[in-house]
From Swiss-Prot:
Ca(2+) binds at D126, E199, E201, D233. The gene is FAH. Mg(2+) binds at D233, K253, T257. The modification Phosphoserine is found at S92, S309. Its cofactor is Ca(2+); Mg(2+). Substrate binds at Y128, R142, Q240, Y244, T350. Homodimer. InterPro entries: Fumarylacetoacetase, Fumarylacetoacetase-like_C, Fumarylacetoacetase_C_sf, Fumarylacetoacetase_N, Fumarylacetoacetase_N_sf. Keywords: Acetylation, Calcium, Disease variant, Hydrolase, Lipid metabolism, Magnesium, Metal-binding, Phenylalanine catabolism, Phosphoprotein, Tyrosine catabolism. Belongs to the FAH family. Changing A35T: In TYRSN1; atypical mild phenotype. This is Fumarylacetoacetase. The lineage of its organism: Eukaryota, Metazoa, Chordata, Craniata, Vertebrata. The modification Phosphotyrosine is found at Y395. It comes from the Eukaryota.
Amino acid sequence: MSFIPVAEDSDFPIHNLPYGVFSTRGDPRPRIGVAIGDQILDLSIIKHLFTGPVLSKHQDVFNQPTLNSFMGLGQAAWKEARVFLQNLLSVSQARLRDDTELRKCAFISQASATMHLPATIGDYTDFYSSRQHATNVGIMFRDKENALMPNWLHLPVGYHGRASSVVVSGTPIRRPMGQMKPDDSKPPVYGACKLLDMELEMAFFVGPGNRLGEPIPISKAHEHIFGMVLMNDWSARDIQKWEYVPLGPFLGKSFGTTVSPWVVPMDALMPFAVPNPKQDPRPLPYLCHDEPYTFDINLSVNLKGEGMSQAATICKSNFKYMYWTMLQQLTHHSVNGCNLRPGDLLASGTISGPEPENFGSMLELSWKGTKPIDLGNGQTRKFLLDGDEVIITGYCQGDGYRIGFGQCAGKVLPALLPS
């Protein structure tokens, strides 16, 4: 239990302690903090208290504007920091609890802080690891018998996304312009995307990387995963449909990707590990680990249109539905010798479950625009309208506490039409 008051339904109890980067009006310098209840503990203020065997030599990582340096230190440093912070914030520990002056400087209300991207993202890769999502899309665009492509059950399919347009929660997303072909019998046209979609995803940040040419074996993959965030991989379905052959997504994806600001460490999630769905056929040996696991993370997508007093829940899903694991994704990414670096972002792909209410995109929820999604108050959607705000939340439910991720939110702005 922490000496900082934490509500039972708070995302950020002492069991969590996610890392983020924030600034305040009084101090606009981006710096690293840890969320506890509705407060932020400013690690740049207390960095001198990290006196363990690893962090005593690396206190300066908490004086950086991003988490990259801390991510790169590896598991020993992360575990040392977590144990120290849980002890420091404990109701029984006087060091910070009873130091009135230090507490005054070190704690900031989350409501008064501006959040930033947690890391400088050198590279961003998006996977396609939900079997239900891949099957749904395959049925819509091909047929039931050929829903999954021949490679899908043998490797975690992915593509390289655009790191420069990954933004933190709360950043508006402008409706993209692009080339589309709405009528197969007519030439393509240029204009504003009409089929704008959201995608419910999660992503993880890479910790220590690997040298070019040296793959990461699956037995060591967990050592390279720092923590997880929520993600909305905004998608322009009409632009994507016309452009994606033969090289895959490009402008239909690269206009914006939203992530939540707080990175939940893997040690906070391990109590919620569950067996991974059975993989059949058995993957090749380099993708096999002894006890494949995933995480029981409850996920929701809410949509609030202009004029709506309350957001409508359009999707309830769970990360445990994913087919390919994070360890397999990271291992496969490096198997050809590709070098990963601290702060790289690897995303799950759309998270869809077995029931229609578990579908993680409007493409699926509206079944390619044929079934309007009821928002209540007489409003429906097939795809996103200007002014719509999409809010993704997620948490693991413990006994009397929850490990939450905060919000991953973004509002759609109108396209910038050519003059």
